[in-house]
């Protein structure tokens, strides 16, 4: 039923939907009370306790995003769902300051993988903390890049196409019929709408269910010495105990593509075990803020923290295949040392047990080089072929 012309129409908004409610002004005295109460509820709901910031995000298709006009905008980006009649929605907040220029800005991603939570939590905090009046350039924050994987709490988009987003940045992603699932379309969205607008890329990861790490910021070796220096400096500002320099042979990586485009690109490993590590959140928040302030995208000052401040960060390189110890059979892993421990070549750093061959001795996981245990399997049960220990070369020894 349509309201009479003289009856006000109030739109209630819940989870991105607006529901029209007609409130008649005529009738008994209680009508006035109900009308006033409902309007008060609407006013309370539509504003946060931190001022007049809108809680409701606009749901838009990618082509309707405004990532260039001055101001702040909060979106749910809608990409068509593969099965239900609807959309995958992921949050995007953009700040554009008065000094923003074409092709310059920072993007920070969380939840490239759906079971890694320090990045999403750190970015969710920053969405609320960053003030528009402090913004000078362009800032794009995407706390949950892969909503399908995040919903299922898995590394891949298990409920949809089963693809790992950090392997989806391949030729034809989102364009070729064979690569048209939601995960490849997210990669295409990043390529089409994000890459042209930023020169700094921060991809916040954790170990998830697979591995526990010595907490680190990480990056690949790049040929351009100026780009390499800027990347290392950006990584140091996270404050983590380690900086991981890792192999760049895996196809389809988001950071690899950003690096090839000449962008200052840094990733992280901020925790493990599908939990939220408070130190990981602290490091993630620090790294994003430092990149913003140090590159003139946001006003303010920032001081080094933790291992960056103390000058104790270690550069750990895991480029050679000898760094990795794969499981020769499915079994249960027993670590003998903690991540971050210095070890010698030939030292046994863990055991792999086969409980089906109960009376056999465990398989010894032996370090192939002098270095530091950078990562180990998180769960005790491991499948055949999984890298259960990574011993990285300490470049600062």
Regions found by a protein language model. Name each.
Residues 8-12, 22, 27-28, 32, ...:
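Structured catalytic-domain cores with a bias toward divalent-metal coordination
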